[in-house]
Every structure is written in structure tokens, then in C-alpha cells.
């Protein structure tokens, strides 16, 4: 049985708050991908300027409310499985799913919240 299923696995939620820098561009890659159960999946968003690690990552499944996964680049929110992790390399911020499970097929969003200087 082919367990490969297409999944929209990354998107962006760009919100602005008073005092937040609105001139920062966020670029996603890939915009979507297909993956098999058990695979390691990496999703990246790139900031056009330094956001000092101020990045949150979210997950949304069809028909469900959005769920907060990771704050400040790499800190897991309470109850988030350990197969999820976040990392940073320069201006690239990644969400990594160590071993994809069926419940992980969803849309994923990043939110930068860097403060103004």
C-alpha cells in the first residue's frame, strides 16, 4: 500500500502588532510537498531582515482551530510531540518533523514578531 499522501505543509500567517516591524518579508520553501509516513520533513521560512529569533510556528488541520507549536524559534509549546523541532541558520528558520505521522498532515504557518529598534 502506498502511504504517500500530498500535504500542504507550510504557509504563512503574517500578523502585525503595535510596535512590530511591518517591513519584514517572510518567504516560504517549499510552498507545499508530498511526504511519506516516517519521513523526516523540513520546512523553511526566510526573513528579509534580522528578526532576532522572534518566530512562532503554528499548525492548522482542516476544520480545526490553529495550534501553536513553537515559540522563539525552537521552544516547544506544552503538549507538542517531541518529533517537532525548530532551528535557525542565519535568516532561515526551519520547522522539522523528525518522523512524519498521519496526524501531521496540515498547513503550517510562521509568524515573526520582531520589535522595532
From Swiss-Prot:
GO terms for biological process: adaptive immune response; immune response. Residues 23-45 are annotated as: Framework-1. Residues 1-22 form the signal peptide. Residues 57-71 are annotated as: Framework-2. SUPFAM superfamilies: Immunoglobulin. Residues 111-117 are annotated as: Complementarity-determining-3. Disulfide bonds join 45-110. Residues 79-110 are annotated as: Framework-3. Keywords: Adaptive immunity, Disulfide bond, Immunity, Immunoglobulin, Signal. GO terms for cellular component: immunoglobulin complex. Residues 72-78 are annotated as: Complementarity-determining-2. Gene3D superfamilies: Immunoglobulins (2.60.40.10). It comes from Mus musculus. This is Immunoglobulin kappa variable 9-129. The keyword Magnesium does not apply.
Amino acid at each position: 500500500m502506498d502511504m504517500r499522501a500530498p500535504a500542504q505543509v507550510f504557509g504563512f500567517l503574517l500578523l502585525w502588532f503595535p510596535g512590530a516591524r511591518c517591513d519584514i518579508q517572510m518567504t516560504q520553501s517549499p510552498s507545499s510537498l508530498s511526504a511519506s509516513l516516517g519521513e523526516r520533513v523540513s520546512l523553511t521560512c526566510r526573513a528579509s531582515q534580522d528578526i532576532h529569533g522572534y518566530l512562532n510556528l503554528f499548525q492548522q488541520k482542516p476544520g480545526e482551530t490553529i495550534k501553536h507549536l513553537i515559540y522563539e524559534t525552537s521552544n516547544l509549546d506544552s503538549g507538542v510531540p517531541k518529533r517537532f523541532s525548530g532551528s535557525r541558520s542565519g535568516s532561515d528558520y526551519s520547522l522539522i518533523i523528525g518522523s512524519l505521522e498521519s496526524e501531521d498532515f496540515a498547513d503550517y504557518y510562521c509568524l515573526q514578531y520582531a520589535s522595532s529598534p
